[in-house]
A protein has these predicted regions:
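DUTPase catalytic domain/fold
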Residues: 1-147
C-alpha cells in the first residue's frame, strides 16, 4: 500500500525528475524543472515539474520557494506557498501535475533548464475544524477548487 510519495505524470518518462531530499534531515523534497522555460522580465509562469504527489486523506503537500531562487535565479514563488491538496492527485484535468508559479523579479530574461531544482515540497498533516461539513468533489486541475 502506498502512503505518500511522487510519481511522474504520464507525459514524462525521465525518472531523474522524481523529487528527493538532499540530506537526511531535510524536510523538503526538491522539485525540478521538467520543460525548458524562458521567463520574460516581470512575467509570471507556471513551471511544469513533471510529477504528481499522492498522500493520505489528512495530509497536504506545501510548496516553498528555494532560498537561493531570488538571489541566484532572480525568481520568486509568487503565491508564497503552494498548497497541493490530496484530491489534486489523479484529477481528470491534468492528472495532478504539480506546477511552480514563478515570477521573474528582474528586467532580464531568465532561462530554466530541465533538471534545475525550482521549489521544495513538504508533506504535512492538517486539522479539521469542528462542524466542518465539506463534501465537495474536485472536478478539475490547477486552481479548480475556487468558486
Amino acid at each position: 500500500m502506498k502512503i505518500r510519495g511522487f510519481e511522474l505524470v504520464s507525459s514524462f518518462t525521465d525518472e531523474n525528475l522524481l523529487p528527493k531530499r538532499e540530506t537526511a534531515h531535510a524536510a523538503g523534497y526538491d522539485l525540478k524543472v521538467a520543460v525548458r522555460t524562458v521567463v520574460a522580465p516581470g512575467e509570471i509562469v507556471l513551471v511544469p515539474t513533471g510529477v504528481k504527489a499522492y498522500m493520505q486523506p489528512t495530509e497536504v503537500l506545501y510548496l516553498y520557494d528555494r532560498s537561493s531562487n531570488p538571489r541566484k535565479k532572480c525568481l520568486v514563488l509568487i503565491n508564497s506557498v503552494g498548497v497541493i491538496d490530496g484530491d489534486y492527485y489523479g484529477n481528470p484535468g491534468n492528472e495532478g501535475h504539480i506546477f511552480a508559479q514563478m515570477k521573474n523579479i528582474t528586467d532580464q530574461e531568465v532561462v530554466l533548464e530541465v533538471g534545475e531544482r525550482i521549489v521544495q515540497a513538504v508533506f504535512a498533516t492538517f486539522l479539521i475544524a469542528d462542524g466542518d461539513a465539506a463534501d465537495g468533489v474536485r472536478t478539475g486541475g490547477f486552481g479548480s477548487t475556487g468558486h
